C-alpha cells in the first residue's frame, strides 16, 4: 500500500501504536498462561499430597470373625483385642499351618509351601530350612521324592510349653509309588514371636503376625515300615 509522503509520520505512529498494543497483549497472555500453569502445578502437588496421606488407610487389615454362644457373629481387627480363646485359636492354627507346610511334601504345592514357610521364619530359621529344602542337599524331598511320592501330615495335638513356645505332635505318612506307606509320629517344638509390622500381603497368610524364631522336630514312633523313608 502506497502512503503519501505527508502522511508517513502519522502512518508510522499508527504502526508503532499497533505493535505496542500487540506486545502488551502478548505479555498479558503470557502472564495468564503462567498463572494457569502455576495453579495447575499447585493443584497437582496438593492432589499428590492428599493421595500420599491416604495410602496408609488403604493397607490390608485382617478381620477376625468368631461365633458367640448365642449364634451371633462378632469381629475384631486386632488379634490382641480378641477374646483369649479366640486369640489362642488363631495362634494355634497359624503354628499348625507352618508345621504342616514345612513337614509335608507334594511336588505340585512345593513352591507355595516353600514361600509361606520362608515368610513365616526368622532369618536363621529361614536359612536352615532353605538349605535343607533346596538342591543339591541329598536329604531334600525334592531329591529323594521328586514327583514319585509325597509326604502327608495330620495334626494330633498342640500344647503350650511356655507363652511363646509350643509343641505340636503330628502323624507323618510317606507315600512312594509302588511301595507301602510309612507312618510315623513326630513332635515339633516351635518358638515364636508376635510382630505388628508385617506387610499386608503377608498378613493374608499369617493373620496372627507370627515369626518362628526356633524350630526343632524329632521322631516319636514308627507304626509301620515299608521300603524305607527319606
Curated annotation (Swiss-Prot):
Gene3D superfamilies (alphabetical): VirB8 protein
Any one of the GO CC terms: plasma membrane
Membrane topology: Single-pass membrane protein
UniProt keyword annotations, A-Z: Cell inner membrane, Cell membrane, Crown gall tumor, Membrane, Plasmid, Transmembrane, Transmembrane helix
Ranges per topology, Periplasmic: 62-230
Cytoplasmic side: 1-38
Transmembrane segments: 39-61
Biological role stated in the UniProt entry: VirB proteins are suggested to act at the bacterial surface and there play an important role in directing T-DNA transfer to plant cells.
Protein name: Protein virB8
Gene name of the record: virB8
Amino acid at each position: 500500500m502506497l502512503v503519501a509522503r505527508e502522511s508517513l509520520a502519522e502512518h508510522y505512529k499508527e504502526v508503532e501504536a499497533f505493535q505496542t498494543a500487540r506486545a502488551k497483549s502478548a505479555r498479558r497472555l503470557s502472564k495468564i498462561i503462567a498463572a494457569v500453569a502455576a495453579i495447575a502445578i499447585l493443584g497437582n502437588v496438593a492432589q499428590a499430597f492428599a493421595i500420599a496421606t491416604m495410602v496408609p488407610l488403604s493397607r490390608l487389615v485382617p478381620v477376625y470373625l468368631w461365633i458367640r454362644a448365642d449364634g451371633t457373629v462378632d469381629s475384631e481387627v486386632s488379634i490382641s483385642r480378641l477374646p483369649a480363646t479366640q486369640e489362642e485359636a488363631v495362634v494355634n492354627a497359624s503354628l499348625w499351618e507352618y508345621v504342616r507346610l514345612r513337614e509335608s511334601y507334594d511336588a505340585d504345592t512345593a513352591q507355595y509351601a516353600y514361600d509361606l514357610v520362608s515368610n513365616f521364619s526368622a532369618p536363621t530359621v529361614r536359612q536352615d530350612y532353605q538349605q535343607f529344602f533346596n538342591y543339591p542337599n541329598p536329604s531334600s524331598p525334592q531329591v529323594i521324592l521328586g514327583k514319585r511320592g509325597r509326604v502327608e501330615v495330620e495334626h494330633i495335638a498342640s500344647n503350650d510349653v511356655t507363652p511363646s513356645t509350643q509343641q505340636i505332635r503330628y502323624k507323618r505318612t510317606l507315600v512312594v509309588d509302588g511301595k507301602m506307606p510309612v507312618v510315623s509320629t513326630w513332635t515339633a517344638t516351635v518358638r515364636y514371636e508376635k510382630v505388628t509390622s508385617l506387610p499386608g500381603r503377608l498378613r493374608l497368610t499369617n493373620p496372627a503376625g507370627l515369626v518362628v524364631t526356633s524350630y526343632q522336630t524329632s521322631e516319636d514312633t514308627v507304626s509301620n515300615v515299608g521300603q524305607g523313608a527319606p
